[in-house]
């Protein structure tokens, strides 16, 4: 039966910059490692492609001057706050988000990382940055037209049957326009802001110099400031190549469509003839936002099927193929007129390398099949840096206390938030710094839990024959892998 499409369906395309950090970071799954914009472990090919060129010294000097001016303005505002009551540290913290906004896109991106990583930067600082928005006025029309000529060889009026000059979303890295192809297909066109690459490159050079200075102090060395900035620079450079976003999107969905559980998942079609490093053209999709439960029910769609598709996307993508969507907030998930979930904005992708995937499968096998908590503890040590070593018997008991409830209740009754808090406490006790990829995938499960409560509150996941079959097959594969390793 075809669902009736009402006024709740609307055209949609989004990219993460247009959403406040508060919406992205409504869940808190923090162990001890910050979550950077993309998680990419063991993959160097894209990193090599996405490196930004070093800017000339005069350009860097100009950005240093601009940065110094903004810092001076912050100091003046801070001095004005001093007569007020309250600790001076809190007064400084309250000034920082506005300073980051004034400094521009690179610092706004870094501010969004602070907002989503209270475990690394502290709750009070993180809380202040959650209101940081990345919305700026659109670029000048003539600059946009020049970019089209440079990237696609002609102006938008000649490339498209129609092109809306006014973008419907505008942020520091890119802006997005509606357009229509000559073939009649409606599309959205994401355009990189002219000149942004050089500005970001200059800012990153400044941040790298600053990180070198910060590491002269003990706190800077403990936070690995240079590594943090280097990783941030790689990820931001990758975000500036729209071809990588399009490739990630297509690779991800092709993995999922290989299984029947992937039938309710789709992504916008990329129009490669109109896609380059700085222009990304995709089909325009109409749909209902995933957290609009009333509209989804009114349209006649099955909330259980939608939640199953979301869970499958994280499990199959992350644990089997090592590629998962890294930002499942509601603005990136819509339900189309066929009842499929449309995933948007693949600027944030999580990548888990084969070794870590193997360790994760071994951890699942040790905890849930063999109930060998000592073996599980050794696997955790292999997965991350354990700062506090304890006797093996005590570590095994601590893991057993954590894992036993997982084996005694159905997953449908579990709270991923509670599991996250317990795991966080366990990690704190041992000073475990798990790979950021695992922290990132944990956040996606918390988003899914929220949608589960909205769309399928009475659904028992482990009573569902389709999912139990999927997990049973997964565990059989893990057992076979384990057995073959023993035989070898």
From Swiss-Prot:
InterPro entries from the UniProt entry: ABC1_dom, Kinase-like_dom_sf, Prot_kinase_dom, UbiB_kinase
GO-annotated molecular function: ATP binding; protein kinase activity
One GO cellular component, as annotated: plasma membrane
Pfam families linked to this entry: ABC1 (PF03109)
Entry-linked SUPFAM superfamilies: Protein kinase-like (PK-like) (SSF56112)
Family: Belongs to the protein kinase superfamily. ADCK protein kinase family.
Name this polypeptide is given: Uncharacterized protein Rv0647c
Organism placement in taxonomy: Bacteria, Bacillati, Actinomycetota, Actinomycetes, Mycobacteriales
